[in-house]
Amino acid sequence: MPQCVMPSPCPVLVPDVLPAVMPCLPAVPEFVPAAPAVPVLPSRVPADLPAEGREALARALAGPVPGAQRKAAGKLLLPGDDTPLAWDDAELTRLCGFLRSMSDQRDHRGRRIPLDYLTAVAVTAGAAGDDSPDSAAAWAASAPARVLHRLGAPRDGAVQPRRPDAATFSRVLGDPRHAQQADDALCAWTAARARDLRPGMRRHLRIDGKALRGAARGGTAPMLLSGLWDDGTTAAQLPVNTKKTNEIPVFRDLLDKIPEDDLTDAVISADQMHTQRKHAKKIQAAGAYFIFTIGDNQEKLFDAADALPWRAFAGEAWTVDRGHGRIDVRTIKTLPPTGQILKKWPQVRQVFLVERYSYGTGGELLGAVAVLGITSLPPDQASAADLLAYLRGHWSIEMHHYVRDIAFGEDGSRGAAAHQAFAAIRNAVTGAFRLLGAPGIAAQLRASRRDPYRLPLQLLGLAALPPAPA
């Protein structure tokens, strides 16, 4: 058998003396980072935008600052645990006190489910994301007896609480008399909580109407006029009979629903429809201030405001915001009212002009809008920057409508029964979450659904919140 012979390794020749200079490899060009491109301003920039505003616009065109456009993620989601609920008896008593102020319009012989208990169950179920008669009944059917007892449940026999069904929610809360009372009681309760949690603030009341498109019958959608505070709580809400009238006469009734102490020194804003002299007098009589925009419904006022020498003055304040695929630049100017304006509107202390320019992220101009307005706030109490902040706060009421439509699915709900009562419940839940600093209503509702008989009670303040995880 032939033997395998391994070849001998090749000898490695190493010189006795290494050269003093080793041959160099071809030089590699040193890497020099390219200078960031200087963003070019759009061809059409507001003429009175100052240098700082132009720099802010240039930075916005360069791209968003990482994380700058996102809200800070809160820590309020608070997953449930197995520890017993620590009930807050004072807050529970306060809620039940407001709900017991309602007058039950049913015959006393058929009241198996008290109105205050039914509303308390509906609110707690709403905080768990169950904001319709069917889903609230499902929440109540599975709720622990101890929870329903604390909410005021009457007992069947010695132990079992009475559990309302979907028909009871629809029939009782669908009664307009009960729905309005529930709306008023929940608004009063959330206002009391807001005063405790956020005292000493000049409050901003934003008034706007919202159609409940999902509950439309015969081509007409129910309309609700709401007053929303800047902390996210609802001050009052009233239905609008769109077949006979519009929002204008309901405006003053809405203000009558709000306690005088809450209106004193508050700022009230509304859209062009509510720029009415009667509204201005009503607000001034309440000790509050108004901010109104001017439209075609006040032609003489618009012409007088438009005739002011706006081009002779530079903008006093500005903002630049990037988000939703566009960049918005807003500027504002203020001027004192003329005698022509004061003749019909003696409450006015400032007239303002807001211009908004919207750009695409590439710098192309998407649109421009100019808005004229009046306010009873004097310059020493509200600068141009303050007025711009109030106006942006008013326009953000659309975000509240978006939460009700998307997070709660209000527009997708086809149930016409009890629509006002459950809209009031959504308002109360949203306000409670906002007061605690929830990072997002939809995310908080998802967390509540995972722990439906503990976390909603804690978020409504009826039980103590667990310690936040480290």
Predicted ranges, named:
Residues 216-264:
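Electropositive, glycine- and tryptophan-enriched low-complexity nucleic-acid-binding patches
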Residues 209-211, 229, 239-240, 272, ...:
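Short, structured patches in soluble enzyme cores that scaffold and shape functional sites
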Residues 121, 136-137, 165, 169, ...:
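Short, conserved catalytic/metal-binding motifs centered on acidic residues
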Residues 256, 310-313, 396, 430, ...:
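Generic secondary-structure signature for well-ordered alpha-helical cores
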Residues 248, 252-295, 299:
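Domain-level cores of phosphate- or acyl-group-handling catalytic modules
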Residues 358-433:
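A C-terminal functional module that forms or caps the active site or interfaces directly
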